[in-house]
Amino acid sequence: MDRTTIGPVAVVGIVGFGVIGQRWAAAFAHAGHTVHAYDPDPASEAAFQAASVQLTADLDALFPGVTPGPIRFFSDMGDALADVDFVQENGPEDIGLKRELLCEIERHVAADVVIASSSSALLVSDMQSACRFPARIVLGHPFNPVHLMPLVEIVGGAKTEPSALETARHLYETMGKKPVVMNREITGHLALRLMGAMWREAVALVRDGVASVEDVDRAFIYGPGPKWTLQGAFISNQLNASGMEDFLTKYGPTYQAIWDTLSDATLDAPTVAAVTASTAAAVGTRTQNQLKDERDAGLVAILQTIRQHGAL
């Protein structure tokens, strides 16, 4: 998660300056880029200013001794994007609105400027379908909280050029991010699908009364969580035997038996009620802000450890 010298991207345009866009802006600026931010909501600038001190402190803990680039705010998209080298789009998760927004961004930037969308689940092929220059549209999906989490998922659509993917990958890497370039599109991309599979089983376990939210979370935090954080699921499992083939041979039947009994989870009213009540019991008297502060402080320490000891 180290940084390298800034390449040809000097000015980054941020379109959509909500929570995701604000944290992208902080990360780009802290990596030395000039940031031009635009959002139709004038209150977004004040919201960022209120959060900026803590965002900068978080980034300083990960990357000390740097001088951040400037963040400039614009009330007009054309003015914001007039001379940018890269655009990070953070609009609503609606395919119709996303297409319109990408087409509008295109009107204000040169034909070779890569436009990366932060979309959580939409496919690039669908998003780029109405674009004039679809070859430069890519996915650049971050993980929350964006300014801290290293992962950025990159993938192109049917009309994306490989050079656009490489531009995005190089930019994110120079910021200290850990980009993964996917081989093809799929709904939910990579990490959310992995999380979704685990989350579905966790919800079912709570719904069916197998365990409480607190115990489900404890099982992960104090079980596979630390090992997976350092080495991922595959390498961690390989270490449980003399190699992956040996692991699959020895423990394959056990996992197959588990897979054969995994549950489906539908978020119907009874399930929502059960999960909500059990989560409230686990949270106790802590507020949302307290939980967020606990998370972000802990993430800094964890990410510093991964930088020193992580396998990948």
Stretches found by the model and what they are:
Residues 117-183, 188:
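Rossmann-fold dinucleotide-binding core
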Residues 1-61:
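NAD(P)+-binding Rossmann beta1-loop-alpha1 motif at the extreme N-terminus of oxidoreductases
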Residues 35, 87, 115-116, 137:
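Hydrophobic/aromatic residues located in beta-strands of well-ordered beta-sheets
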Residues 31, 154-185, 196-226:
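Internal alpha-helical scaffold of NAD(P)-dependent oxidoreductase catalytic cores
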